[in-house]
């Protein structure tokens, strides 16, 4: 897990970041306890399409154009969805290569954000930066970061 900071002229904030393939309840609990921000899962367009996710708002009017989708939860294997264990399970399910929209439900307690193709060269956001950093790392499945504002 690391802290990713942006330019002081943008948001001037940091995000806790780790790769979703390494998710566990301890890391989610750390983010919730110390980051105290919204726990988000960055997805590329392909993974978001597999999950059948739609944007949270039909017209994005936020200052930084963050591409939030509807919130999600694993369809099976969770209780209320809010616990660190449940959110960890949701992230594991959502980042599987063979996932489909049948595996998740909305609304939920994990907030996906779709990264823009082209990374930080297209949008200088934490979402794209975390994906760009994860790309060279060789994992057995998708390299999709989990982020939480600090």
Which residues make up each language-model segment?
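N-terminal, positively charged regions that mediate nucleic acid binding
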Residues: 1-13, 17-24
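Structured core elements
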Residues: 3-5, 17, 40, 69-71, ...
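Glycine-rich, N-terminal phosphate-binding loop and its surrounding beta-alpha-beta segment
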Residues: 24-83
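Hydrophobic alpha-helical hairpins/lids featuring a short glycine-rich hinge
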Residues: 61-118
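Structured alpha-helical segments in the cores of large, soluble enzyme domains
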Residues: 100-101, 126-137
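Active-site helix-to-loop segments that bind/position phosphate- or nucleotide-bearing substrates
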Residues: 123
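Conserved small/polar residues in nucleotide/adenosyl-binding loops
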Residues: 140-146
């Amino acid at each position: 897990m690391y802290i990713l900071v942006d330019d002081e002229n943008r948001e001037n904030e940091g995000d806790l970041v780790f790769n979703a393939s390494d998710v566990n309840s301890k890391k989610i609990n750390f983010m919730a306890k110390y980051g105290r921000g919204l726990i988000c899962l960055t997805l590329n367009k392909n993974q978001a399409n597999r999950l059948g996710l739609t944007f949270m708002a039909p017209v994005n009017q936020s200052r930084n154009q963050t591409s939030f989708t509807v919130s999600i939860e694993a369809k099976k294997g969770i209780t209320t969805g809010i616990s660190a264990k449940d959110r960890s399970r949701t992230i594991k399910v959502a980042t599987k290569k063979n996932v489909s929209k049948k595996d998740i439900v909305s609304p939920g307690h994990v907030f996906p954000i779709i990264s823009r193709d082209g990374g930080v060269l297209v949008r200088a956001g934490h979402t794209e930066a975390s994906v760009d950093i994860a790309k060279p790392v060789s994992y057995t499945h998708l390299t999709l970061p989990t982020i939480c504002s600090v």
